Amino acid sequence: MISSSLVRTRLAAILLTAVATNARANPAAIVPSGGEAGTAGAFSVDYEYELDSARITRERAGDPTADPLAPPPKHDDLQFSQFRHTLTPRLDVGVYHDTWATIALPIIITQARELRLASGVDRNASPTLQDGYLPQTGYDAQDPTTPLSGDLVFRGQDRKGIPEIRFGLGFAPMNQRRDDTKPTWKLGADFHLAVGRVMRFDRMAPDAETGVSDGVHKLTLWTTMDRKLGFYEPWIKLAWTVPLAARSTSLFQDPGFGATNVMPGQIAAAQFGVELYAVDDKVEHNSLSIELSGRVKAHFEGRGYSEMWEVFAYAGDARVAGNPLVLDADPTNAGIQAQSHPGISNIENYLEVGGSVAIRAQLGPRVHIAATVDVFKITDHVISFADSGIDLPTCGTAGAGTNCETDANDVVNPGTKEINPAAAPAIDRVGARYHSEQNLGLVLGVTGQVLF
């Protein structure tokens, strides 16, 4: 017979040394409840290390070797990579019977990204370098005066900070701990309060912009269902996130005129899994389990920070004469009212599909620790996707109202309020758009949780 103290010692040694894992507690298992010792609340700390990569391709209209009846041909351009370390302390406190409040503070310790030439592409063949969005010598935000060598063409500034504070409220209409004939069913809402410095890029002073927040407040509604059946514990989680409002310093501003989809896209997610117990000692409150889970997350069309956002901002700086991505702030006035491209762009719908394997342990009635490996893939999608504008109804027709045009046509007229000032035709029109392909991600980390 192995003593409970030895079990605890070995589990702690295994899990605390597994720094290359991503630990997230089963989202449906614990229900904080006001005034009840042992379940009054929980404090947890989650550490994550995330790696992301993608192939960047570019549409090239006019390719003489392409089929004129086929979609615009795409050419390999760049290879994107990014890593991020995140530490998230979280506090759940019971405020009433099976009702609790939550506060979480994600802290990005460091985030770094870079772009290299794709395999088989040299500096003379890269569409991005050919069009002058980056210089032939590349751009190093950490050392702007030194040319980049090899296949490296862009290195961003290391970023860090607090992107948001999450406030939540949850309620469990059913709790298996109280009635073992029923599952545990939870409902909740989380408010994401955007704080901290907004993520911007300044080619003149790159070290002055190290923020990580998008500056957009969001709301997430979620529900989970969990049922422990002997040594098995299946669960499911559904969630929906919608942007609410942007801070005045955020890049997500409505320029008016014919602009559409100026906020980040909504997100719908489904996560499901099963926890399998190898040890489940109800007397000593020790357990050891492995969990298998999967998820599907739908990202709907909207503006966002793509893999190329810093390059777009670099090439759209209105302070640099002749920059190719400078925007026109007022399309109704003659000439160009130069406005810097913010870097964010309209991004096509895409799916994120992932799966994870976790090792979880309970050490006595209060302590939970876990380690998880999470792998995900993102479907190919367009990352420069802004419409040229909107065709307004003809004035005087039924339902036209005051926001109308005098011409009776079905086109977006240049030089009118139909034009979208946020669109950069050089990257947003069909035949010039950027695509993000072969997206892969890996998240590794550990979690510790204490109940009180």
Where do the language-model regions lie?
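Outer-membrane beta-barrel biogenesis signature
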Residues: 21-68, 177-184, 435
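Short loop/turn motifs that connect adjacent beta-strands in outer-membrane beta-barrel proteins
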Residues: 26-41, 98, 114, 174-187, ...
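Residues on the lipid-exposed face of transmembrane beta-strands in outer-membrane beta-barrel proteins
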Residues: 47, 87-95, 103, 167-173, ...
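Surface-exposed strand-loop-strand hairpins of Gram-negative outer-membrane beta-barrel proteins
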Residues: 49-86, 116, 202, 208-209
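Gram-negative outer-membrane beta-barrel proteins
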Residues: 51-59, 109-115, 175-177, 193-201, ...
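Outer-membrane pore/translocation modules
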Residues: 110-263, 397-408, 418-432, 436
